Amino acid sequence: MRLALSVDPEEVALLCARWPDAGVESAALAVADPFLTGEHQLLITDRRRAEICYIMHRGDPAEGVLLHIKTFYPAGAYRLPTGGIHVGEAVLETLTREIFEETGLTVGESGDTVRVERLLGVLRYELQHTTLGAVSFATYHFLVQMPAGAVLDPQDPDESIGGWQWRPAHDLRAVADVLETVQVSSRVWADWGRFRALSHRFVATQLGA
C-alpha cells in the first residue's frame, strides 16, 4: 500500500474486514480562506492525507466521551480530538501515536492501556475551496476505551491542549451546534467550525445518540 490517498481502497478494505459494521460516507462543503490556508487551520499541510478522530470513553459513551480545546481556539470550541495521518503512515499507526501524544496513554490489549473497540466509520469530504479548488480529505472515527484510573497527561507541548471535558454522547449534536455558530463570534474560524461540526454529527449518528 502506498498510503498516499485520503481514502486508500486497500487500507479501507482491511479496516472494514476487521470492523464489518464500519462504512464510508461522504460530505461536501464550500469553504474559503483562512480555512486550509491560515495559521492553525492548515489541515492538509505537513504531508497529511487524512486524520483520525478518537472517541474515548470510560466504560459507556452515553455517560461521557472526551472533548478537548486548544489554547488558540475560539472560546468554548471544545471538540473530539483528531490527529493528522501522514503520507506513508497507516491509519492505526496514527491512532496509536496521536492518543499517546495528546493523552500520554498507550494503545494495547492489557487492562492498563487504551483499548480500540471499533471503527465507527470514515467520513470522506469534498471541500470546494475558493482559492485551492477541490480538496479531498477524510476522518477515520474510532471508539476507544480509557483504562480505569488513568490520568490524562499530554506528551507533546505542540498540541497546545488548553483543557478537557467529558460530555455524554447525546450532547454531541449540541457540540456540533456550538462549532457551527463559532462564525458568530469569529469569522476567521467560521469554516473551521462548520467543518468540525460534521464529524460530531456523524459520530452521534453512529452511536445512536
Provide a role label for each language-model segment.
Residues M56-R58, Q145-M146:
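Residue-level signal for short segments within beta-strands and strand-turn junctions
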Residues I85-V182:
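Unchanged
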Residues G59-G64, T130-A134:
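Short, solvent-exposed loop/turn segments that connect beta-strands within catalytic domains
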Residues R2-A4, A75-G76, G149-A209:
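Nudix hydrolase/Nudix homology domain
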Residues A62-E101:
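Conserved Nudix-box catalytic region and its N-terminal flanking loop in Nudix hydrolases
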Residues R49-E51, Y73-A75, L80, V135-T139:
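Short connector loops at helix/strand junctions that flank enzyme active sites
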Residues L3-C53, G59-P61:
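Acidic, metal-coordinating catalytic segment for phosphate/diphosphate chemistry
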